[in-house]
């Protein structure tokens, strides 16, 4: 028995691949990885001991491209698919798991050509174009969101690494705010943090700001100009995000699916600012259910005024009829919304098929 994991491009897809690879390793099952030279795949897995072999193809996405660039991307995808077909055959792969993203294309189609069972994890509430096409052909489609289109859909807990559960706690007061710009940085969140920093620090609220490597120097300069650089924690990125989340009492974040469910597992109340240009507005739909259940606050990017933060803080500090702060109630309910061992459930479901 030997698995192939494929897909990625961004941290959200890759974090799922990592969680599944860790579970395969725990169960003593060998796995290889197939991704792309474009995006973050190599950064995550080029030297990863989780895989016996790693392959990266020269491929790019097709969505939001001009006609001629789409043709070129499709050609690269097809070329890589035939290479992937030989690789899967060489390694005698018995199962393929796609975590989505354009880099999943070659190995997914190669699996179908080789008649290898294909399993998909759809991380978002709105399917990407590749997963929409492949879902009816897959053995199973795992997701934490309910879908009604064609395909054998299996509702599972999101495959969040156990460290997020292990560092969870129920919040009781807001002493520390985390601004999470994501691996690629988020200009709107970075500006929101800078605009609110003077008032927050004056009120004695600690700030941790992860701004993304491309924005670090500029953001650092502005904190220095504000005279706040020595009063806040600023990082381009952080290798121990679970510890950072553990210390925070409130978070401001984009609404990529992995971030949403990691924050949920940690019990960290969050203000989500969905990326408005995400395909099919999927970031908004990722948190729609949370918003309906009063488990988060969603602020459209075009409404992101500094006063919004303090409006949310006031609401979180209000008490319900039982005398519990909204902050504490939300924090506790978040931890109940997601079950541990999502990756284990997915792997065991595949093995029992």
Swiss-Prot record:
Residue spans crossing the bilayer: none
Keywords in UniProt for this one?
A: Cell cycle, Cell division, Cell inner membrane, Cell membrane, Cell shape, Cell wall biogenesis/degradation, Glycosyltransferase, Membrane, Peptidoglycan synthesis, Transferase
Q: Name one GO molecular function term.
A: undecaprenyldiphospho-muramoylpentapeptide beta-N-acetylglucosaminyltransferase activity
Could you tell me what reaction this enzyme catalyses?
di-trans,octa-cis-undecaprenyl diphospho-N-acetyl-alpha-D-muramoyl-L-alanyl-D-glutamyl-meso-2,6-diaminopimeloyl-D-alanyl-D-alanine + UDP-N-acetyl-alpha-D-glucosamine = di-trans,octa-cis-undecaprenyl diphospho-[N-acetyl-alpha-D-glucosaminyl-(1->4)]-N-acetyl-alpha-D-muramoyl-L-alanyl-D-glutamyl-meso-2,6-diaminopimeloyl-D-alanyl-D-alanine + UDP + H(+)
EC number(s) for this protein? 2.4.1.227
Q: What Pfam families does its record include?
A: Glyco_tran_28_C (PF04101), Glyco_transf_28 (PF03033)
Q: Which residues bind UDP-N-acetyl-alpha-D-glucosamine?
A: 10-12, 124, 183, 283
Write down the CDD domains for this protein, in alphabetical order. GT28_MurG
Matching Gene3D superfamilies: Glycogen Phosphorylase B
GO BP terms: carbohydrate metabolic process; cell division; cell wall organization; lipid glycosylation; peptidoglycan biosynthetic process; regulation of cell shape
Topology of this chain in the membrane: Peripheral membrane protein
Gene Ontology cellular-component terms listed: plasma membrane
Its annotated compartments are:
Cell inner membrane
Q: What is its pathway? A: Cell wall biogenesis; peptidoglycan biosynthesis
Against SUPFAM superfamilies, the record matches this protein to: UDP-Glycosyltransferase/glycogen phosphorylase (SSF53756)
Question: PANTHER family recorded for this chain?
Answer: GLYCOSYLTRANSFERASE, UDP-N-ACETYLGLUCOSAMINE--N-ACETYLMURAMYL-(PENTAPEPTIDE) PYROPHOSPHORYL-UNDECAPRENOL N-ACETYLGLUCOSAMINE TRANSFERASE 1
Per the record, the similarity remark reads:
Belongs to the glycosyltransferase 28 family. MurG subfamily.
The protein's job, in short, is:
Cell wall formation. Catalyzes the transfer of a GlcNAc subunit on undecaprenyl-pyrophosphoryl-MurNAc-pentapeptide (lipid intermediate I) to form undecaprenyl-pyrophosphoryl-MurNAc-(pentapeptide)GlcNAc (lipid intermediate II).
HAMAP family found in the cross-reference section:
MurG
Record protein name field? UDP-N-acetylglucosamine--N-acetylmuramyl-(pentapeptide) pyrophosphoryl-undecaprenol N-acetylglucosamine transferase
What is the organism of origin for this protein? Helicobacter pylori (strain J99 / ATCC 700824)
Q: Which gene encodes it?
A: murG
